[in-house]
Swiss-Prot record:
It comes from the Bacteria. GO terms for biological process: cell redox homeostasis; cellular response to stress; hydrogen peroxide catabolic process; response to oxidative stress. It is found in: Cytoplasm. The active site is at C50 (cysteine sulfenic acid (-soh) intermediate). One of its GO terms (molecular function) is NADH-dependent peroxiredoxin activity. Keywords: Antioxidant, Cytoplasm, Disulfide bond, Oxidoreductase, Peroxidase, Redox-active center. Thiol-specific peroxidase that catalyzes the reduction of hydrogen peroxide and organic hydroperoxides to water and alcohols, respectively. Plays a role in cell protection against oxidative stress by detoxifying peroxides. The lineage of its organism: Bacteria, Pseudomonadati, Pseudomonadota, Gammaproteobacteria, Enterobacterales. This is Alkyl hydroperoxide reductase C. Coiled coil: none annotated.
Amino acid sequence: MVLVTYPAPDFTASAISCNGDIINNFNFKEFTNNQTSILFFWPMDFTFVCPSEIIAFNQELSKFKKRNVKLIGVSIDSVYVHHAWRNTLSHNGQIDKINFTMVSDLKREIQRSYGIEHPQLGVALRATFLIDKNRIIRHQTINDLPFGRNISETLRMIDALHFYEKYGEVCPANWKKGDTGIKTTQEGIHKYLEKISKK
């Protein structure tokens, strides 16, 4: 299901905070509070690709904070399993601690509302949603279970969104932070094509 351009479905569920506290009624809308956010799903704790993704997101967390972006993760595990997994990752020396909120989707209602439930296994596919300050989904990626996602690409898309919001210029192929955009006029596209033809 493609949700880009649509409002992000709201939800209230149990969660583990970045401090490891259990939140019984975590509300997505209240937590994001008109900030850009990344909502990402993984299948289950204590599996194989999932730890690599959680660690990768956690290692880059300062880059999300620098961009004023809230990071929220979701799986079908209970808050108690989330808590145990956090401790296991930490005790194994892989990370100090997980510093973002982990939501429990025990009833699978959240993953279904985002249309990313695996049709046979009932777990979430590896989905990532970039949601703007008006709670509109601007970008989404969905990977099958064997394939971990690229955190650098997630950050690049955040930069692209913020660039567009600030300057009103669109971002061409392979755009990255520091590059110029394209003004949405005939003159703008002409200048861009002229520029790349000289490379």
